[in-house]
Amino acid sequence: MKLSIILRICLWFMGISMAFPSLSQTMLVTNGNTSSRIILKENNQISWTAANLLQTFIQKVTSCKLPVVISQTPRKGDILIGGQSPAEVTEDGFSISTQDGILKISGKENGVVYGVVTLLEQYLGIDYWGENEYSLAPSKTVNLPLINKVENPGFRYRQTQCYAIHTDSIYKWWNRLEEPNEVFAAGYWVHTFDKLLPSFIYGKEHPEYYSYFKGKRHPGKASQWCLSNPEVFEIVAQRVDSIFKANPDKHIMSVSQNDGNYTNCTCDACKAIDDYEGALSGSIITFLNKLAARFPDKEFSTL
């Protein structure tokens, strides 16, 4: 008897769901027809990038081209791009939801585009491999389930040496990639020692600013620093401050050594730090920690 009652209840709920699919679904395209619109909350470049990407791939799947409009009141079945993100969304993070039958994708910085990519991957089953190389299953119907998703990147900066990012913007967006000039203040990205402490300015009069090994100091364009020298720290800190002030829209900079094996400073003070930390990276990490303490609202990368 109990089993019969439970079965009847389950069948009743299934009937409700089938009779009223809009209670659990957001219908974008049905049998090759659509009244859905892509609505931009803000008329800016990142919103247009997200909208164009979504429009392109929904059309590839369904042959339906959804119109893109700006600042209109959404109705059921519409897609809202942009707007306020939940508090837990961080830089380049995003939110996807299908509340009230409306698909909403918002994010911070590039996050709204990454939200579109995630929707296309996880809910429409699209894979993008490279320029004009993608896989998808054509369908005349696109119905989305209930979605309430927030995602933030595990890494603040994401880069690859694949040259496709220069010729294929979709590949770049799809793989959530960035380029140094987009993120790092004044393009200060890897091997920045001689930019921050130019040897042609300081090398001749202050060889003590540069690494000591094999019995002497080695100032030069490819030299490392004497990272325990307090004057070096102050000069670099002032230089970093001026760069950030000249680039107020950026908050990341690379303070990173030059290439070269066994060219690190082995003066008594630097060696003591490295010995204490148990690695040759000890002195550079100690230096960067001091720099991070001086600029608590900034971020630093190194090699």
Task: For each feature predicted by the language model, list its residue ranges.
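Feature activates predominantly on carbohydrate-active enzymes
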Residues: S35, N43, A50-L53, F57, ...
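Boundary at the C-terminal end of the N-terminal hydrophobic targeting segment
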Residues: P21-T26
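Short, well-ordered secondary-structure micro-motifs within conserved domains or adaptor modules
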Residues: P67-T90
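N-terminal signal peptide c-region/cleavage motif recognized by signal peptidases
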Residues: I16-A19
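Short, well-structured beta-strand/strand-turn elements
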Residues: K60-T73, E299-T302
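Immediate post-signal peptide segment of exported/extracytoplasmic ligand-binding proteins
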Residues: M27-R37
